[in-house]
Amino acid sequence: MKKINKIALAVGGSGGHIVPALATRETFCKEGIDVLLLGKGLDNYPNLCEQDIPYREIPSGSLSISRPIAAIRNTRSLYIGYKKAKKELIAFGPDVVIGFGSYHSLPVLMAALKKKIPIFLHEQNLVPGKVNKLFSRFAKGVGVSFSPVTKQFSCPAQEVFLPKRVWASSNSSKELSSSYSPIICVVGGSQGAKTLNDNVPPALVKVAKDYPNMYVHHIAGPKGEVASIQYVYSRGGVSFCVKHFEHDMLNILLSSDLVISRAGATILDELLWAQTPSILIPYPGAYGHQEENAKFLVYTIGGGSMILEKQLSNEVLTKNILLALDSKTIKNRREALRAYYQNKSSKSFYQFICECL
């Protein structure tokens, strides 16, 4: 097998794609491999500059052809991105290119194919995305976050372990755990979720009548109206912290008794790691992958409950929260999450790639 010295990661878009890419980068850096991130939307991810992570912004466009004008614009962006990606790959000279899904990675994968650079993919969800499905026929292998999705690829596919970056636990997290009960975390993913921001606070105010010592850690997302959410909790007499973004997410999950969230792949992976029960309200778009993610955690693992957005109401949400906070329910769901997580693969993405080359 040829020694791997350099790897390019084709990634961009939401945290659901970028977070696993950064975890993968960490794995390769420990092996002494140079890693470069290439993709659309990386300029909008501030952590890359803060942590001195090498990356190049690559234009891209979606594969949608439903709107002719947009399709023409997207085709032009794809072509510009393809030309730039090819230039960057020639300059960097990677031995392998890994795609993390979404159209943001498309030009880089196209350029890698043209340059005959071995391609690998990573699929975070229970339903493969369009780009990963398309390029899997050319890929050497696919690393996945959840083993059931492996059967949907014709090339070699295997569950791989990605490390979690846990910050040193802050005193505030420890103080919360000792001062409040229960602790509830509300999170709508890296982009936030207006549905959760609008519906969850009023339901938690009702629940607080049965749990006066409750604390809510609400992550509203970049567009969340923090002041409005704070007002609802404050008026309802609920102890809270509302933020646009949380750097210390894993420690927050560890200290929580319940998480109310969308059902993106990253939060699912983190919930399993933290073994924290959840109520999942999947985003109804994006080819239904979040609903499948939620079904897996709820029905296959037994680690929480699911409310479809079309069924969401104050009454339904309140009822689900009260059930989720029952001590027996918490115990059973934690045990189910622990049992599943203990059997997850410990093979690194690097090991998997070495086996496939």
Swiss-Prot record:
State the Gene Ontology BP annotations.
carbohydrate metabolic process; cell division; cell wall organization; lipid glycosylation; peptidoglycan biosynthetic process; regulation of cell shape
This protein's superkingdom? Bacteria
GO CC annotation, single? plasma membrane
**Reactions catalysed, as given in the entry:** di-trans,octa-cis-undecaprenyl diphospho-N-acetyl-alpha-D-muramoyl-L-alanyl-D-glutamyl-meso-2,6-diaminopimeloyl-D-alanyl-D-alanine + UDP-N-acetyl-alpha-D-glucosamine = di-trans,octa-cis-undecaprenyl diphospho-[N-acetyl-alpha-D-glucosaminyl-(1->4)]-N-acetyl-alpha-D-muramoyl-L-alanyl-D-glutamyl-meso-2,6-diaminopimeloyl-D-alanyl-D-alanine + UDP + H(+)
The membrane-topology field of this record reads:
Peripheral membrane protein
UniProt pathway: Cell wall biogenesis; peptidoglycan biosynthesis
Task: Give EC number(s), comma-separated.
Answer: 2.4.1.227
Q: Which UniProt keywords apply?
A: Cell cycle, Cell division, Cell inner membrane, Cell membrane, Cell shape, Cell wall biogenesis/degradation, Glycosyltransferase, Membrane, Peptidoglycan synthesis, Transferase
Q: List the GO molecular function terms.
A: UDP-N-acetyl-D-glucosamine:N-acetylmuramoyl-L-alanyl-D-glutamyl-meso-2,6-diaminopimelyl-D-alanyl-D-alanine-diphosphoundecaprenol 4-beta-N-acetylglucosaminlytransferase activity; undecaprenyldiphospho-muramoylpentapeptide beta-N-acetylglucosaminyltransferase activity
User: Where does the protein end up?
Assistant: Cell inner membrane
Q: Which residues form the signal peptide?
A: none
Which residues are UDP-N-acetyl-alpha-D-glucosamine-binding? S14, G15, G16, N125, S190, Q290
Q: What does this protein do?
A: Cell wall formation. Catalyzes the transfer of a GlcNAc subunit on undecaprenyl-pyrophosphoryl-MurNAc-pentapeptide (lipid intermediate I) to form undecaprenyl-pyrophosphoryl-MurNAc-(pentapeptide)GlcNAc (lipid intermediate II).
Q: Which family does it belong to?
A: Belongs to the glycosyltransferase 28 family. MurG subfamily.
Q: Which HAMAP family match?
A: MurG
Specify the protein name. Answer: UDP-N-acetylglucosamine--N-acetylmuramyl-(pentapeptide) pyrophosphoryl-undecaprenol N-acetylglucosamine transferase
Supply the source organism for this entry. Chlamydia felis (strain Fe/C-56)
